[in-house]
Amino acid sequence: TGNDFVYNGDKPVVVDFWATWCGPCMRLLPKMEELAEKYKGKVMFYKVNADKEKDLCKHFGVQALPTLFFIPVGGKPIIEVGATPEKYMQIIEEQLLK
C-alpha cells in the first residue's frame, strides 16, 4: 500500500490524486498551484488524474478524492484525504522542510 514505502529522492514531494468530476479537487487546484509556486525549488508537486491512472491509485490505496501524499526525504508519507488546504502548508513546513 501507499504507506509501505520509503522515498529516497533529494527533495520532498507532494502528490495530489484528483479528478475533473471531483468538486473539492477542482476547488483545491488554485491553492495547490499557489503552494507549488511558494515552495518552488524546495518541494516537488505532482498531480495524478485518478481516472487516467487507476492502477496507480490502486497501488497507493487511494479510495477517495482528493487524496494527497506529503512525502519527506527518506521518510514515510503523510496522507491527507479531503480538501483541507489550511493543513497543507503546516504539513509542508513542519514535516517536509524540518
What kind of region is each of these model predictions?
Residues 64, 69-98:
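Non-catalytic, surface beta->alpha helical segment in thiol-disulfide oxidoreductase systems
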Residues 10-13, 17-21, 64:
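Short pre-active-site segment immediately N-terminal to redox-active cysteine/selenocysteine motifs
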Residues 1-13:
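A short beta-strand-turn-helix
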Residues 48-58, 85:
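Structural microenvironment flanking redox-active thiols in thiol-disulfide oxidoreductases
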Residues 26-39:
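Typically the conserved alpha-helix immediately C-terminal to a functionally engaged Cys/Sec
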Residues 59-63:
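A short glycine-leucine-enriched loop at secondary-structure breakpoints
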